[in-house]
Amino acid sequence: MQSYWTEFGALTLAHLLAVASPGPDFAMVLRQSLAHGRRTAIWTSLGIGTGILLHVSYSLLGIGLVLQGSPTAFTVLKYAGAMYLAWVGVQTLRSARPRAAGPEVVAEKTAPEPSTRAAWTTGFLTNALNPKATLFFVALFPVVVNPATPRSVQVGYGLWMALATAAWFSLVSVVFTQPATRRAFLRWSHWIDRALGVVFLGFAAGLALATLR
């Protein structure tokens, strides 16, 4: 039992460090928070957490090893992810325009608010179409988790990481949708949208150029 807690602690630390690092998931939650508000951002965060479950499932079922050993599968997935991030980047750049900065700006909808399903799907696709995330778990589990650890325990690890991811990005959503914080950001929203659009395009280019190591 003690070894399980050791594994759990190591997995948690490595995963939280990875989740807290700026990346496409963080950029997407920031975009959703500023453009659409808390509800949309939190549902996007839940979609990202669900994406983690997909990557963990790949690792537990051995599909991740197939991806790791198949340049063709890796290439197909990375280009799908790159095209999605590029599309998001272009949409973000197109939405960049000056907006009013008065107190009413927080309540004003600057764009049609996505449905719950659309917000969740956005988060899920942002995470699920990133093959680097799958390779992260494929590399992490064999190093940290003993092969003798029961599959049920490993599933528990995966569920925890999905919940922790959703909780982290939900917290980010709450922080960036505080009225004072959101007002401050919205004063410069057209510049932030432009910057985020460029960031998404940069992530798309980086993913498209990624190689198996």
Task: List where the protein language model places each region.
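Alpha-helical membrane-protein architecture signal
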Residues: 5, 9, 13, 113-125
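Membrane helix-loop-helix hairpins that form the core translocation module of multi-pass transporters
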Residues: 39-119, 205
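Juxtamembrane transmembrane-helix termini in multi-pass membrane transport proteins
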Residues: 2-75, 139-157
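Short, conserved phosphate/pyrophosphate- and ester-handling motifs at nucleotide-, phospho-/glycolipid
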Residues: 23, 130, 197
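Selective transmembrane alpha-helices of multi-pass membrane proteins
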Residues: 68-102, 160, 164-172, 183-213
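Hydrophobic/aromatic residues within the transmembrane alpha-helices of Major Facilitator Superfamily
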Residues: 16, 20, 53-54, 90, ...
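Alpha-helical transmembrane segments and their lipid-water interface positions
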Residues: 25, 51, 55-63, 85-88, ...
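Hydrophobic alpha-helical transmembrane segments in multi-pass integral membrane proteins
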Residues: 58-60, 129, 134-138, 200-213
